[in-house]
Amino acid sequence: MSAPLIELCDIRKAYGGIDSPKVEVLRGISLSIHPGEFVAIVGASGSGKSTLMNILGCLDRPTSGSYRFAGRDVAELDSDELAWLRREAFGFVFQGYHLIPSGSAQENVEMPAIYAGTPPAERHARALALLDRLGLASRTGNRPHQLSGGQQQRVSIARALMNGGHIILADEPTGALDSHSGAEVMALLDELASQGHVIILITHDREVAARAQRIIEIRDGQMVSDSAASQPSPAQPEQLQANDLRQRLDRGAILKGAWKGEMIEALQAAWRVMWINRFRTALTLLGIIIGVASVVVMLAVGEGSKRQVMAQMAAFGSNILYLNGKRATAQEPGGIVTLDDVAAIGELPQVLHVMPVIGGQLMVRQGNSSQKFYVGGNNTWFPAIFNWPVVEGTFFSEADEASGAAVAVIGQKVRSKMFGEGSNPLGQYLLIGNVPFQVVGILAAKGASSGSEDSDERIVVPYSAASIRLFGSHDPEYVAIAAIDSRRVNETEAAIDRLLRQRHQGKHDFDLTNDAALIQAEARTQNSLSLMLGAIAAISLLVGGIGVMNIMLMTVRERTREIGIRMATGARQRDILRQFLTEAVMLSMVGGVTGIVIALLVGGGLLLADIAVAFALPAILGAFACAVITGVVFGFMPARKAARLDPVKALTSE
């Protein structure tokens, strides 16, 4: 006689206790099952036979007692080893079929092999062969709702045999079938028993139980009879699989599975679920899409604005310093920078050019047109200092400056507003204040220098003419200074500071700034603005993440039975965790990609509306990464909840 494959000794199972009444379902069950046996466990509803099957199939653990499988104490096995047993040793056939609704017949049959790490080609071939053997060759692509009850039960039998099905646990396999389909299922079980499979049949129907070699009766959680027949000979080749199980258990051969195959299956299953629930998926995606699109667009607008302002400021030169007298306060009088100071600064070796500036808003007239423009008195270094060339005509000369000539160089918008678009104003006159000035040149378009000031609405006249004819003051409003080396602006600033302190009897009655510092300050301001815009947009991404978590929690609740089915077919906790985490991440990835596409389209529209937009690859990748991380973070809790479900409770959930 062969050694028992399954040994139960004084198995007890109780529920409740402490805060609720204790209910003992199994009371001291002891039995042995040998390789090749066909055993029927018979009992009325509530007798404990299904609980016994769950313990035999490693779906549940007994409260007390000993369960040895192939010589190993099952109590010593961890959750992964129990999953291995369910995957490699057992095959379940349930009364309610327990097929995954979103999968085809073939996909349902292949499930145990996926968790076993079987290569796809081998897996597909075996599933098709099993379905063909069970008369379902033409139904491989059908989903459960497209199959009859008998066909669904045959699919579940094929699934039980996918990894070998050494031990078939059939719980009321004919209970939901008509007599013809029930007879077909029992004939299949008879055939499997004759091939050496251990068949454990759970039923309340004694006529069905009579097909077994051995009948065990359970009543009120106790075994009341056992009509054990003679044990099958262990010499039969079909029974050698039991020895193989013992050897693999002894070696600790716990199959890890092929992570690539499992990941592909997880992705495919996730896509199926998303496609089946398209409307709900779209609503969930909306939060992620809006979040990602908002982040990308906001950062692009901020970056575009920053680049535009920086370009405009840099266009005036980064080697320029500005000098002006300090404003008077209640504590001390104001300072004045004189033309003599300007001349002294021009002698410094660090200074390339120096230019006094006097100016203000004045009424300008030409014909019937009149408007206020900024009029600045400058010297001939204006184009060089501000990198601002004349595109038509000429700039005024040193002779004009020396004589105080009433000549003017105008900006592009002064030209269009006072003379009309496309006109030639050269040689014509503008009445500035009450003084006529002849237009001798037109400056290149420059745009806004900072804020809302438009540099093209500017008129440049000789400093001498402005100070005498227009403003009545010889002292400059401020002084523009160009350093020889833009990399040594700070050194130039220090030299000017020392010179002026000496000239002003040690007083620091002047302010000296440089464009490089202004550009850096503006860059910091723009960066802060971009971060603020991104943070505001990120809130919508957070809301989208909460939506993902909400929908995943709902999904876990809806698919609790599916989780139980996967566990019964050998899925480990990490497999379930991976499955639902993959769904959450895929949801976020699809939302992220869609959000980026929409953001690019919105950005294109903003560009057409002449709004500065600059998409930065790091910002796009960062937004996508945030979407994925959102899926991981907000999908982890629902996935962990799914992985921690009790297999028995999951299978019996509605």
Swiss-Prot record:
Entry's EC annotation: 7.6.2.-
Domain ABC transporter positions: 6-245
Keyword match Ribonucleoprotein: no
GO molecular function: ATP binding; ATP hydrolysis activity; transmembrane transporter activity
Localization terms from the record: Cell inner membrane
Cross-referenced Pfam families: ABC_tran, FtsX, MacB_PCD
CDD domains: ABC_MJ0796_LolCDE_FtsE
Recorded GO CC terms: plasma membrane
Subunit structure: Part of the tripartite efflux system PvdRT-OpmQ, which is composed of an inner membrane component with both ATPase and permease domains, PvdT, a periplasmic membrane fusion protein, PvdR, and an outer membrane component, OpmQ.
Function: Part of the tripartite efflux system PvdRT-OpmQ required for the secretion into the extracellular milieu of the siderophore pyoverdine (PVD), which is involved in iron acquisition. This subunit binds PVD and drives its secretion by hydrolyzing ATP. The system is responsible for export of newly synthesized PVD after the final steps of biosynthesis have taken place in the periplasm.
Family: Belongs to the ABC transporter superfamily. Macrolide exporter (TC 3.A.1.122) family.
Identification of the protein by name: Pyoverdine export ATP-binding/permease protein PvdT
Species, as recorded: Pseudomonas entomophila (strain L48)
